[in-house]
Every structure is written in structure tokens, then in C-alpha cells.
């Protein structure tokens, strides 16, 4: 069984591809159970955000191609078409990838803290679905520890440039100031809350928040000021908006081209800045073809964010060192767990031989055979049983000239160097014991 991380993100696939591979929060449990039922996955978790969709799986190491095919078919897509956008990490690579993701080192905004919360949601989702096992549990706990240590021990979180801040920076390319502007924010999650805060800090006075859950919108405007409205009122209030930012979890667009076109006419073609941070998108892409509409997606924030990444390169280097240490620690634990399983199997095989031979020895004693002879037979036969496999392995290694395997066996079996006389003595003793035991065996069976 190996660990795999398969997925696509903002670097491997544009938004029009990513939005087709999103798992809605209420669909994760069913998806994980379907994944385990239709592949060789033993443990699984799904991390799905606007910038990435990833599967973390412990499964048969001969079948990782199952994951890409399952992901495509689950979303009713062609596996061959999707393959060009996917990446696959195995073993240590999968461990390192989750740790880097959780620490914000693989994010669009380097060091952004939101991804850690999203990773914790993925972890809880696997627990709820019953697909979180001992190995993945340990891996996620290590990843959370890495994220905390990176933020504590490096400067990667200092003066952060969030997606929300980058959104407001992009809007300033259209409007010099926000004092006399109106912003319509669709959604009421953490990103929208941060956008509202940054807009207020830039002097925006008129703020409208639309959300499916009106109470949540009201809670947000209580913090930042403004007016809360239901989604149904968006078409009538849209003409007021100079700035529109959308970030919901809706599976279908909330704003169509026709609605935007009518709003632009009512605005008498005053420019409208629109930023769609959602994946799948909240605004029909065709709306961007309208005159006076400046429509951007989350992928358009790259240049704004690039400066942030350059300023944090030293902190990122320190963070990568922390990640590598934690990767080594996890892999050490993993190897120890695999050794424990081998030790248990090895000891159980020895006990099974002992139980079988003890039963046979008792039968011989009941038949009146001298105890000394039975004990000699038991000792010899049990020794042969236990040493047969190592002996065959050593002989094969010797015939192949594999000195490394021979030395490893000597270390594992704690074999001291013996001179030739000792070896000959041991050989003679074993030969005599073998012959005596064989004669006893023949008499007992006869």
C-alpha cells in the first residue's frame, strides 16, 4: 500500500477546467465512499477549493492510474482529456505535497492561511465519510503541525497579500478611488468579508452584500457596515454597482450576460469592475465581452500576487526546510509501522510452528516415547523450521554474489564471526542430531 496525491490546481489548469472538477461540500461524503467502492483505495480524503481539487489516497501501489480515471468519470469527463491537467505524487512526494499545501507554499498567494482551514475541512470530511485511516490521519496531523510551525518560525505570514487584497488592488486599476463608489459583494464567506474590510480601508462608503443566507449577510454588514440583500434582489441593485466581487459555492452561475447587459444600459455605460473569485464561476464568462464591463477571474490576480511571492522567497526557503524535516519524520514513522507489521507476521509464523510441533510432541509422549528423544526431536525440528527461510535466503544470496544481502542478514540475525573449526563442529553436531531425530521419527511413526 502506498500514498498518492492526485489533482489539479491553479498552476496546472485554468479556471474553466478547474470549475468542472469541484466537489461541493455536501457532496464530499458520497464521493469518498464512491471512490473507495470503485477503486483499491483503503483510505481517502478530498481537498477541493477554488484553486485546487486533490485526492489524497492510500491504495494498491500498482493502480494509481485508477485515481485519474475515477476523478474524470465521476465528473462525467473524458479521462484522456483530463490527464493533461493532472499531477500525481507518490510516497514521499505525496507526503511533501500535502505538507506544502497546508503551509501555503503551493498557494496562489504564498503563505496564505486560509488553505490550512480548508485542509482541516478535508480531514473532517474523510472522518465523516469513514475513509480516514491510521496512515492518512497521521499524515494530516503532521501537515497541520508543519503549517503551524511555518507560520510561527518564518516570516511567511508577515504583511500578507491575500486574494481579497489582490482583488481590491486590481479594482484600483479601474477606479482611482472608492469614496464615491458602490460595491456589491455576492457571498458572505471569509474571502468576501476580507474584501469588504479592504474596500472600507480604501474609503468605500456604499456597500451591498447579497447572499443566499440573508442572516449571514446581515452579520457581515454589522461588522463592516452596508446593506444586506437576498440573491433575488441582485438584478434590481446591480446597476448601482461600480465594483462587484462574487465568491459563492453555487454550482451554477448567479449572474448571466443578459442581466449584466441590462445593468450596463441603466448605468449609461459607466465602467463596471467585476471579479469572479468562485470556482465554478458565479458570472457567465460571456459578460466580459460587453463594453464597459471589466470582468476578471481568480486567475487574473497572478501578477498582483507575484510581487508578494518575490518578497517572501527567503521565508519560503526556511519553510521548505521545515517541510523536509517533517517529511523525514513522517516517513520514519511509516517505515517503523511497516516493520511492526513484518515483525508481527514473523513472530506469528514462529508461534504457529511451535504450536503444531508441541501437539505432535505430546502425541509422541502419550505413545510412550522417551521424553529425552521427544525433546531432542522437538528442538531440532523447531530449529529447522525457524531457520529454513533465512538459510535458503543466505544460500541464494551467496550463489548470486550478493555480499550486501549477506551482511544485512548477519546483522539482522546477530551472527558472530566464527572460525572454520567452529563451523565444522556445528555441522557435525547438526548432522548427528538430524540422524538421531530421524531414527526417532521413524520409530514413532512405525
From Swiss-Prot:
Q: What is its EC number?
A: 1.2.1.70
Positions of the region Disordered? Answer: 417-446
Q: Which residues are the active-site ones? A: 50 (nucleophile)
A single Pfam family it belongs to is Shikimate_DH
Q: Name one GO biological process term.
A: protoporphyrinogen IX biosynthetic process from glutamate
- GO terms for MF: glutamyl-tRNA reductase activity; NADP binding
Q: In which pathway does it act?
A: Porphyrin-containing compound metabolism; protoporphyrin-IX biosynthesis; 5-aminolevulinate from L-glutamyl-tRNA(Glu): step 1/2
The signal peptide stretch is none
Q: Which key words tag this protein in UniProt? A: NADP, Oxidoreductase, Porphyrin biosynthesis
**Site (Important for activity) residue list:** 97
Biased composition, Basic and acidic residues: where in the chain? 420-430
Q: Where does NADP(+) bind?
A: 187-192
- Which transformation does this protein catalyse, written as a reaction? (S)-4-amino-5-oxopentanoate + tRNA(Glu) + NADP(+) = L-glutamyl-tRNA(Glu) + NADPH + H(+)
Q: What does this protein do?
A: Catalyzes the NADPH-dependent reduction of glutamyl-tRNA(Glu) to glutamate 1-semialdehyde (GSA).
NCBIfam families, alphabetized:
hemA (TIGR01035)
- Look up the further comments and give them: During catalysis, the active site Cys acts as a nucleophile attacking the alpha-carbonyl group of tRNA-bound glutamate with the formation of a thioester intermediate between enzyme and glutamate, and the concomitant release of tRNA(Glu). The thioester intermediate is finally reduced by direct hydride transfer from NADPH, to form the product GSA.
Query: What's noted about domains in the record?
Result: Possesses an unusual extended V-shaped dimeric structure with each monomer consisting of three distinct domains arranged along a curved 'spinal' alpha-helix. The N-terminal catalytic domain specifically recognizes the glutamate moiety of the substrate. The second domain is the NADPH-binding domain, and the third C-terminal domain is responsible for dimerization.
Q: What is this protein called?
A: Glutamyl-tRNA reductase
Q: Which organism is this entry from? A: Alkalilimnicola ehrlichii (strain ATCC BAA-1101 / DSM 17681 / MLHE-1)
Amino acid at each position: 500500500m502506498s500514498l498518492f496525491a492526485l489533482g489539479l490546481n491553479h498552476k496546472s489548469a485554468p479556471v474553466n477546467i478547474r470549475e468542472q472538477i469541484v466537489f461541493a461540500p455536501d457532496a464530499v461524503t458520497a464521493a469518498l465512499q464512491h471512490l473507495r467502492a470503485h477503486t483499491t483505495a483503503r483510505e481517502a480524503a478530498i481537498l477541493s477549493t477554488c484553486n485546487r481539487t486533490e485526492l489524497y489516497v492510500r491504495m494498491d501501489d500498482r493502480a494509481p492510474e485508477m485515481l485519474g480515471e475515477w476523478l474524470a468519470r465521476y465528473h462525467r469527463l473524458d479521462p484522456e482529456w483530463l490527464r493533461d491537467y493532472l499531477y500525481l505524487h507518490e510516497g514521499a512526494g505525496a507526503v511533501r505535497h500535502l505538507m506544502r499545501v497546508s503551509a501555503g507554499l503551493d498557494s496562489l498567494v504564498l503563505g496564505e492561511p486560509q488553505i490550512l482551514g480548508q485542509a482541516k475541512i478535508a480531514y473532517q470530511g474523510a472522518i465523516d465519510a469513514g475513509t480516514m485511516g491510521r496512515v492518512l490521519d497521521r499524515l494530516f496531523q503532521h501537515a497541520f503541525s508543519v503549517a503551524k510551525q511555518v507560520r510561527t518560525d518564518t516570516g511567511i505570514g508577515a504583511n500578507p497579500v491575500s486574494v481579497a487584497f489582490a482583488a481590491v488592488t486590481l479594482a484600483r486599476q479601474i477606479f482611482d478611488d472608492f469614496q464615491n463608489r458602490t460595491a456589491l459583494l455576492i457571498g458572505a464567506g471569509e474571502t468576501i468579508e476580507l474584501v469588504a474590510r479592504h474596500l472600507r480601508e480604501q474609503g468605500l462608503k456604499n456597500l451591498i452584500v447579497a447572499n443566499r443566507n440573508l442572516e449571514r449577510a446581515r452579520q457581515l454588514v454589522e461588522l463592516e457596515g452596508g446593506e444586506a440583500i437576498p440573491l433575488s434582489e441582485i438584478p434590481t441593485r446591480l446597476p448601482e454597482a461600480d465594483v462587484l466581487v462574487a465568491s459563492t459555492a453555487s454550482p451554477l452561475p448567479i449572474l448571466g450576460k443578459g442581466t449584466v447587459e441590462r445593468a450596463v444600459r441603466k448605468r449609461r455605460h459607466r465602467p463596471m469592475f467585476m471579479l469572479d473569485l468562485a470556482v465554478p464561476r458565479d458570472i457567465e464568462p460571456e459578460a466580459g465581452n460587453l463594453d464597459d464591463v471589466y470582468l476578471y477571474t481568480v486567475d487574473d490576480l497572478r501578477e498582483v500576487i507575484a510581487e508578494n511571492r518575490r518578497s517572501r522567497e527567503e521565508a519560503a526557503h526556511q519553510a521548505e526546510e521545515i517541510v523536509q524535516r517533517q517529511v523525514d519524520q513522517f516517513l520514519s514513522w511509516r517505515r517503523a509501522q511497516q516493520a511492526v507489521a513484518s515483525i508481527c507476521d514473523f513472530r506469528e509464523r514462529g508461534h504457529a510452528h511451535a504450536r503444531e510441533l508441541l501437539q505432535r510432541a505430546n502425541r509422541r509422549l502419550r505413545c510412550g516415547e522417551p521424553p529425552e528423544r521427544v525433546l531432542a526431536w522437538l528442538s531440532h525440528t523447531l530449529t529447522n523450521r525457524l531457520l529454513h527461510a533465512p538459510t535458503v535466503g543466505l544460500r541464494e544470496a551467496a550463489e548470486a554474489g550478493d555480499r550486501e544481502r549477506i551482511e544485512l542478514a548477519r546483522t539482522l540475525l546477530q551472527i558472530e564471526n566464527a572460525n572454520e573449526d567452529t563451523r565444522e563442529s556445528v555441522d557435525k553436531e547438526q548432522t548427528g542430531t538430524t540422524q538421531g531425530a530421524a531414527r526417532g521419527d521413524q520409530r514413532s511413526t512405525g
